[in-house]
Amino acid sequence: CSAIATNRLGGHFAIQGGGSDLAFPHHEFSAAHAEAALEVDRMAGHYVHAGMIALDGVKMSKSLGNLVFVHKLSEAGRDPSAIRLAVFAGHYREDRDFSDAILAEAEERLARWREQLSEEVSEAEATDVVDKLRAILADDLNTPEALSLLDGAAGDCNQIIATALDGLLGVRI
């Protein structure tokens, strides 16, 4: 990995990421290799590792054959924005579960937000919500807190907030 990364990105790059199962020893060893070979202090400015996602309590893996693919959920008629909300309900660094029940909750949340979309909110109120949303996401991409903020603001949601939600999280309401 270090050879590929440094070949494509150079001796230092902003972010290296992967699953939490790769943090040690894989990423630590590849960073040590690159740092020794290139004589740099750090190969990446930041290391980001995502938690594992289980399906109904069992870690998803190719060997178990229990992988859930977003494109297959979409092809089955599930709303891509609801799929995102289901994943965003847990913090990216935490191990978390995925299930039909969690996806159904996300679909209900999305439907509630869409139903409550209103233009009756002042621009100042909407801007305040968007500013809070940005601050929450800037704090280690805290998507569970962001969703909580948006649940509280859903009745006050207008097009400004909807546009920010699409731009920041890729969720269309």
Can you annotate each of these PLM segments?
Residues 1-121:
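Alpha-helical recognition segments enriched in aromatics with Gly/Pro capping
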Residues 73-82, 101-103, 136-144, 155-160:
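Structural motif
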Residues 106, 126, 162-165:
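Hydrophobic packing residues in well-ordered alpha-helices of helical domains and bundles
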Residues 119-132:
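Extended alpha-helical coiled-coil "stalk/arm" regions
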Residues 135, 144-173:
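Basic, alpha-helical terminal appendages of large translation-related enzymes
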